[in-house]
Design a protein with these regions (language model features):
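Basic, flexible linker segments flanking DNA-binding modules
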Residues: 1-80, 177
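Mobile genetic element proteins and their domesticated derivatives, centered on retroelements
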Residues: 6, 22, 38, 42, ...
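Conserved, non-catalytic sequence blocks in retroelement Pol enzymes and Pol-derived host proteins
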Residues: 12-15, 30-32, 76-78, 94-95, ...
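RNase H-like polynucleotidyl transferase catalytic core
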Residues: 51-57, 146-150, 166-183, 199-203
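An active-site-proximal beta-strand-loop segment
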Residues: 74, 78-113, 119-120
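Active-site beta-loop-alpha junctions of metal-dependent nucleic acid enzymes
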Residues: 116-139
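Catalytic core of bacterial c-di-GMP phosphodiesterases, primarily the EAL and HD-GYP domains
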Residues: 141, 145
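Charged alpha-helix within mobile-element recombinases
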Residues: 160-164, 177, 183-217
């Protein structure tokens, strides 16, 4: 029955709903199942959300600091948590205002480890995000890679020192190669397809609350 309902919801919404949105719809219909089960069933059924392609926000400003090697090399799977993390920044625009989202995703299960929303793409957004992630780790870690693109934030010495102090190894995508960070790109695409493109937001505050509800759901 659950599989049938998933297929119905998926098709009724023109294949734009991912596992989070479908889980919410199931709950609205008094079908209690967690989002991890829905994601697993969608994978078994071969249901893939059709993401609308939009212009990608880029924080790349050239080589303003040290560029780390690509250690991840598109190996997006791991059988343990806190072994491979990915991060990136995306931009939303409502009227003439902008909002920036910076999350860290664990490749073990695709869950959001930590995130930060900011009206400006500044370095404090990145450090606040890291602080939230570090609180979920022991004082010192081993064998954890944090992968990003070559955005200016990730080239900063302060950022790199924060990772080193925690025992985290930095990895970066090759220049202008978004597929090297495909999991983060897909997360942004899914969020925008399920939430941002489907609803009309009158203000940045309204959008910010919706994103928090979406991620924390």
């Amino acid at each position: 029955m659950v599989k049938e309902q998933i297929v119905i919801i998926f098709n009724e919404n023109k294949k734009r709903y991912g596992y989070r949105r479908i889980t919410k719809e199931l709950h609205n219909n008094d079908i209690r199942v967690n989002h991890k089960t829905v994601r697993k069933l969608m994978k078994q059924l071969g249901l893939v959300c059709q993401i609308r392609a939009k212009r990608k926000y880029s924080s790349y400003k050239g080589e303003v600091g040290e560029v780390a090697p690509n250690l991840l090399e598109r190996h997006f799977k791991t059988n343990q948590p806190n072994r491979k993390w990915v991060t990136d920044v995306t931009e939303f625009k409502v009227n003439d205002q902008k909002l920036y989202l910076s999350p860290i995703l664990d490749l073990f299960n695709g869950e959001v480890v930590s995130y930060n929303l900011s009206r400006h793409p500044n370095f404090k957004q990145i450090t606040d995000m890291l602080e939230g992630a570090f609180q979920k780790l022991p004082d010192k870690v081993d064998n954890l890679i944090l992968h990003s693109d070559q955005g200016w934030q990730y080239q900063m010495k302060s950022y790199q020192n924060l990772l080193k102090a925690k025992g985290i190894t930095q990895s970066m995508s090759r220049k202008a190669t978004c597929l090297d960070n495909a999991v983060a790109e897909n997360f942004f695409g899914l969020l925008k397809t399920e939430l941002f493109y489907l609803e009309k937001f009158d203000s940045i505050d309204q959008l910010e609350k919706a994103i928090v509800d979406y991620i924390d759901y």
